[in-house]
């Protein structure tokens, strides 16, 4: 089914207001959920909203909380989210990283006691739209086995890197082959994943999303490489924020909250003049796109370049929403 942007946003806002979220906060939060969904990231927009509301009702999310600065060391700052709404806080933290970068050329904000930020790519995009290189990542609850293990001990720990090209080039990836949100998208669509997503109960690689959702045996991206990347991202986020690690979130909390996050903005125009920057970026993009195709009918694309077209399509023709998800939201 298709739903208009405004209808989606108003439904999000209705549910938030019904839970006594302040009107201005409900408006901004609903807008961010609608923007994420319109951009085609359904897994962390409309599909994620019911779980977000569940955590709000349990008290994991404190809607009136505001992040506060704990420590400033020039280009690096520590902040405490106080369990505020994740996507609103993340947006503020990337804005702050850009402000610091305006002074020092680079800005780093390390955040503790944060909630799930929903679409992490939105914050990299936020920086790149204003001409900065945007880098951010978060740790999580333990939802993936380290390489060689059966038991979940590491996070998917999404990493985002966005570069101010035209259109914006952005990698937005978890350290697993698939996030749980994308597994849900495939399951709801009744299809297998395109590549192996995890292990079945016998330890064999599988593309069945439901199996991996149930047994929690996600496949790390690049096998041992994704496992290792997850671990070091967790270490850095924990140290810079003085916040909780994956191990601590998992052992001390009953759900995924009070996570640690990093936001980095780099003012690249201080390092290279505009014309040279554009020439170099266009050279890179053209060199990649003009490689001989493995399939003549399938164009080579750069990461993130699809979002502009997806958003335009959804704006013109309505946003695809799974009927069961929509009915769930309507019932909240």
UniProtKB/Swiss-Prot annotation:
One of the record's GO cellular component terms: cytoplasm
GO molecular-function terms, A-Z: 3-dehydro-L-gulonate 2-dehydrogenase activity; NAD+ binding
EC top class, as a word: oxidoreductase
Residues holding NAD(+): 168-174, 224-225, 304-306
InterPro entries according to UniProt: Diketo_gul_Rdtase, Mal/L-sulf/L-lact_DH-like_ah, Mal/L-sulf/L-lact_DH-like_NADP, Mal/L-sulfo/L-lacto_DH-like_sf, Malate/L-lactate_DH-like
Reactions catalysed according to its record: 3-dehydro-L-gulonate + NAD(+) = 2,3-dioxo-L-gulonate + NADH + H(+); 3-dehydro-L-gulonate + NADP(+) = 2,3-dioxo-L-gulonate + NADPH + H(+)
Catalytic-site annotation from UniProt: 44
Main localization of the protein described in the UniProt heading: cytoplasm
Keywords assigned: Cytoplasm, NAD, Oxidoreductase
EC number annotated for this UniProt entry: 1.1.1.130
Subcellular location: Cytoplasm
Function: Catalyzes the reduction of 2,3-diketo-L-gulonate in the presence of NADH, to form 3-keto-L-gulonate.
Quaternary structure (record): Homodimer.
NCBIfam families listed in its UniProt record: PRK13260.1
Family: Belongs to the LDH2/MDH2 oxidoreductase family. DlgD subfamily.
Protein name per the record: 2,3-diketo-L-gulonate reductase
Gene transcribed to yield this protein: dlgD
